[in-house]
Amino acid sequence: IRAELAELSIEHDTNKKIGIISCFFDPKNVDESIELINNELKEFNIKHLYWRKVPTDKQILGTLARESKPSIYQGIISAENESPKDFEKKLYLFRKTLERKIAEIDFLNIHINSCSSKTVVYKGLFTAKQTADFYWDLRNPLYKTRFGIFHQRFSTNTSSTWDKAQPFRMLAHNGEINTIQSNYSWMKAREVDATSSYWKDDIQSIKPFIDNSISDSGQLDNAI
């Protein structure tokens, strides 16, 4: 990312942490989607550096995956004076607030794959071994990581879509959680009275803790 910043002549203090908002957009509404996210970044006083269209090779995709492929973008952002821990906390709060606003706008189909200064999600409707064939970033020697989480299994009780692909933001999981509905109900019941010395008043902004419209694996990821 710093190499791209230099190419684009965008100034950035290298002592400040960089974050990446990884998104799937409806190809018909890319500009509106970016505008919504940029406005929310301003509300949170998060410095936006640039948007990059993630380089991909759609030729490796099957017919269904190619026809349903979203526009894949990454928003590159920067910490200001926050510590790395506080910046990550701010990004979580930003994402939860943004997702609530997205849910209120019917015509915008936006999925936030990840929003973090520590991890970035690359996923889609293809096998694990095709990941680097589709995402050119993962063949770039400038990209380095301490670990990677891969997920090979396709959904069995829901139709496969790009946003349902794994890994999620924290984990990859095979699902089939038999107690998912009761787990969700207990979390929802406790959510009303939940308090936190870490989140303080901001705890209201990260509710609901669990999105009941997604898969059981996705709900587990919400909880983590």
Where are these regions (language model features)?
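Conserved short alpha-helical segments that host acidic/polar catalytic motifs at enzyme active sites
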Residues: 1-224
